[in-house]
C-alpha cells in the first residue's frame, strides 16, 4: 500500500451564524480555500489534479448539485478536473480526506484536493410535495441542523432525538455533570482565545474579502465564534436547551457556523513530480456505528478500531483533535479512551465549542489543525476524531514528517 501525504492545507475563518460570512454562497465559500492553495502553488500543473473530494452535510440550498464540482470550477481549476461531494453529516470533511487518501493509497489516483464546506447561515427552508390532492398537511423544515422528512419506521425503531437531546443522553448514560461540562467549555474558550491573541491560526486561515456597501469591501481574517471572556458564573446562568433539569446549554455546545477548508493530498510519485513538500502522512481512517440516541460516543469505537488496525494505543498520540459537538460527549469520549478531562494535548487551541462547527467543514479543519499543531507544538502522531448524527464516529491518524 502506498503512502498518502498532506502537502498543504488552508481554511477560511469560521463565521458566526448570521455573521460576516452570511452573504457568501456555500459554493463560493468552498472555492475560497481551493483558490488559496492555487495561489500558494503557482507552478503546480493544476490540470494534473485527479479528483476534488469535498464534504458537505446539508446540500439542500446553494450547496446542491455536487458542490465539489461547482467549487472547483469557481476556483478556476480546469474543467477536466472531476469533483465529488461526500456526506457523512458532521464527518463529511474528514470523510473527504479519508476518501482521497484511500484512492491514492490504492493507486487509482496520484494527486487530489480534499476538504469540506458548510454555510449554516444560508441553509434554506424546505417543504415536501403534497401526498394527496388538496392536502393541507405540508411541513416546512429548517435545514440548518437536525432531522427532516423523517421515516416513521426509523422513528419507531430508534427515535429521532434532536442533537442537544443526544448530548443529554450521553451526559446521563456516562454520568457527565453540568459542572464538568461547563469547565470543559471554559477551557475550550480560554485556549482558543489565547491562540487567537497569539496569532496562532493566521497560518491556517486564508482571509475572505466580502463586497461592502458605502464603506467598501470587508476582509474577514479571524474566527468570529470564540468568546474568551466567558466565565463559569456566566455559563452557570444559562438554561438547558431541551430538558429541565438538564445539563446541555448553548454555552457548553458547539456553534452553528459557516466555513470551508481544503488540502492537497499526494502520492510519493506526485510529490516528486510536482515538487511538493509533504508535511504529514495519513496513516489510516476508521468509522464505527453506535445507537443514534448516543451518537456523541461515536469517536470511541472508531478510535479503538483505528488503533487496533494500526497497532497503536491512545498514549501513542501526541495530539488529539476531538470535535466538541457537546462538552458532554467530548468528556465521555475522553474518559472512555482513558484521557483526562483537562488533558493539554486534546484540543490545545480550543475546539468546536469555541471555534464553531460548520458541519461539512469541521472534519477537514480537524485534520488541518492537527498537522499545524504538531508542527508548532512538536510531536509525531495525531488523532482527529468526531461524532456523527444518526449514530456514527470517524477517526483519522496523521503522522508528522521531519
Predicted feature locations:
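Active-site-proximal alpha-helical scaffold in enzymes
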Residues: 87-118, 171-200, 262-269, 334-335, ...
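Conserved active-site "lid/cap" helical segment
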Residues: 1-75, 82, 166-178, 188, ...
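Active-site pocket-lining segment
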Residues: 168, 204, 212, 283-354
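Flexible glycine-/small-residue-enriched beta->alpha junction loops
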Residues: 105, 111-169
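N-terminal extracellular/periplasmic Venus flytrap/periplasmic-binding protein-like
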Residues: 11-12, 22-23, 27-31, 43, ...
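Conserved catalytic cysteine-centered active-site region
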Residues: 24, 56-112, 144-147, 157-163, ...
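Condensing-enzyme catalytic core mediating Claisen C-C bond formation in acyl metabolism
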Residues: 1-24, 145, 231-297, 301, ...
